[in-house]
């Protein structure tokens, strides 16, 4: 959708709203319960890294609050899964990545658990970050969240 006002085109872009974020967080929590991994913190941000939703499960690690938010921000900001950022920093075999300096970025998280959220056509909507379980389980939870809204992306 485009509108023209005084010769200037206004572009309409899809956004993550609170209702979509709640569906995603619910799906992540359902995956955590089904798979019985540690409780998690869930952060969902838009493309400007503004927090749309944050949810902390009972007994999720307090230090993971900040990590979940930073995973979401990292994945929205670059925008790739934080697992890819880990590979860029440390390499797939952990012998050194092609961009090791990323590790020194203050708010960047370079391990799995953050995923970008995109429309089917590839438009970036934001990202989800999950922290509290293992990195692989965090990523599994984030993937379950995105899968829950695939039909409307």
Residue ranges and their predicted role:
Residues 1-2:
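Classical Sec-dependent N-terminal signal peptides that target proteins to the secretory pathway
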Residues 5-153:
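Flexible, solvent-exposed loop/hinge segments and secondary-structure transition points
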